[in-house]
Amino acid sequence: MTADLPATVIGCSNLIVRGGRYLLVQESKEPARSLFNLPAGKPELGETLAEAAVREAREETGLDVQVEYLVAIYHCPRTSEGVGVVNFVFRSTVAGGMLRTSTEHPAVGYFSREEIAELGRAGRLRGVHVELAVDQCAAGTRLPMGTVQLIACAPSPSPAGSQREQG
């Protein structure tokens, strides 16, 4: 772990399917330059995982999506960048917007499972999670949205004995 990075990063990815094809975006920044990935990113403070997935889809593809269900949760204890990743993959449907490219994602498009497998064999996917998620989605894997529970985070109570002594 480096001083700039947390030990584990949370990611939220979208599986957006049209006609049996899966939407991928091409990355433009190192260390993933030119690699294809699911539309994905990190939640901002105060944002739920599903809200982060919706925002990231809009930012990366121009599409407004609605999260349907959770397909998978992947944990990579250590990436090549020296951090751990826990990635929540959601099946999302297009609710509006127009598909577009951006500076960060110079190519976006729908790919068949076979094309995604070819990208994987050629080392052109961001990670093995892309193929795994596509295969799990195609197999009909659905995790209940309640798998991830939203909780209120209150300050921890004062430890015993930390109160001032009367005297």
Question: Which residue ranges define each predicted feature?
Answer:
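Short connector loops at helix/strand junctions that flank enzyme active sites
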Residues: V9, V17, L38, V65, ...
